[in-house]
Amino acid sequence: MINTSHRSQSTFQPSVARGASPQETVTNKVDLFDPAQPPDPLRQAFDGITNAGGVAKAQLLQENQSAWNARWKLVEGAKDSITAQYFCWDHDALGMALLGHMFKKARNEEVQIRLMVDSTGDTFGTRGFKSHIGGKDYLQEVVMTGNAEAKVYHPHWKKVIDQALAIGSTAISANNHDKILEVDGNRGITGGRNIGYEYFVHPDDFKGAWRDQDIYFEGKETAHALRRAFDVEYGAPWITQKVRGDLLGNWVQRDLELLGAYKMMDLWLKDKPLSMEEKQHLRSSEDGRKGEARHLMDRALAALPDEGLERAASRRERKSLLKLAEELVGYTELRGSYNATAPDMHDAEVKIIDKTSSVGIGTDELNSTLWNLAGAAQKSIYIENPYVVLSEDMIQGLRQAGERGVQIVLGTNSPASTDSAVTQAFFLRDWPRLSATIPNLTILCASGNRKLHAKTAVIDEQATLVTTYNLDFISQHTNSEVGSVTWSKEFAKETVDGFNQDQADPLNGVVEYKILRDEQGKPIRRDGLPVLDEKGDLVNEPEVLFGPANHLTPDMLSQYQKKVHRWDFLRKILPQLNPVDTFRKH
């Protein structure tokens, strides 16, 4: 997100591409090592990511409907295998449909499937598939096809034991935050999106729809690297719990509901798009939605014999499907979106960077790669991240880049758009210090209806990161995280274009947080006290020109101040709480 109204020189625009085209970069690397040319530090840092991917086709998934259809088509085209891991996998209309799609692939086509969900992503077991309170029966139905396996990552009872065995550790907050969908060893998707309606519906259908970002790729080396990131956590029996069928079979059959949810979604995506009048009717008329939902459900049930399911739906099953259908028909922009123009596909190199959780085997390729790439930046670093509580090493890394003259733009949430009160409380406390001590830093915050959830960065208009990684302690030290690094000027440009579109979108309400500076850009105060010492360290609080107090209510500011005091007190008496963040949808 870019805001040019406050400081025009901070606008992040890609320069004219220099040197090889993305295609030449992929197919002919000789020019990269020409001794007559000075070495490119960023390319050297990228080449230092070993055994993690290679030549691929890459597609940036910015729009929510495109991201959903990419997943639908990926599963639809699976011939041999599917691996999937999501921090959150809700049993709403979208989550049930995707699980039903995989059930169909396992049951009817004998595609081998492995699924994993995180226990904290479904904290109380009511919204996902980890427990019988929620939807474990459906996960069991998939497993009982004989062609699927499923696991729950770090169940709460294991968390309690691990924490008791290691007092003061981060075991209580060690989650699998990965978002992985990989098919047939040659295609995959990763990025910020979980499986739930907020991530895939249009803002016209739900004002609070998330703004997120994923990458779809085609390439064997990259797909195998993403699968390895799945395997390293899936294959750890001391952290995971296998999902098994009930002792005497699944006592309540869920096959018809799963296939019905799949078929309703498939029909809805492939139907003729709705006219504007039809959309408005469904959005405004409850009777209209109920009528459309019954029609959609009846069409799906009539098609189930073609999927090998001949029996009639029971009253319970019809009630369950009708509820899903009534939700689905409210997402009017999804209707007919299957055949919409897809985002551009780019020739690129795509590498996967992985990190296991703090109770895993200790693999961490992600943090070191992030620092190496940031350390190699010569011109610009653009970051979009929803939760910003920077550690000291993160701050120092960005500070060193800024001191080299690198322009740094950080886009994140404000309290008006966030879902994480805890991280925002600390960001509100920290941002003036970041602005004062990191040279060439611009801080832009969303303050509108949409929640920013993208976890991306573009470095020197060439290397693009699309990850699951939040800029906080949890992601850095405790969670399992995964991400991609894409080498392509075209892919980087498209990402930057998306940032600029975010700035212009009134739903985001982007504002720039600023401190008082002199004409040379040095932080100053009106009372004459210095802000920084000779080393560039903070000695007095900066003076805020525009910040939270300029766009938040006094009540909201007071609530956040209380949160900071409360957490600072708790962290003093309970050091193990230092990494604990909100257990909302990250």
Predicted regions and their residues:
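Long, C-terminal catalytic modules of enzymes
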Residues: 244, 445-586
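C-terminal low-complexity, acidic/polar tails when present
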Residues: 273, 277, 282, 296-301, ...
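Sec/Tat-exported extracytoplasmic proteins
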Residues: 79, 86, 109, 146, ...
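Non-Sec secretion/translocation targeting segments of pathogen effectors
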Residues: 1-27
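HKD-type phospholipase D/PLD-like phosphodiesterase module
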Residues: 39-41, 46-81, 88-375, 413-462, ...
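N-terminal carbohydrate-binding accessory modules
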Residues: 22-45
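Long, well-ordered mid-to-C-terminal structural blocks that present hydrophobic/aromatic surfaces
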Residues: 370-372, 376-418
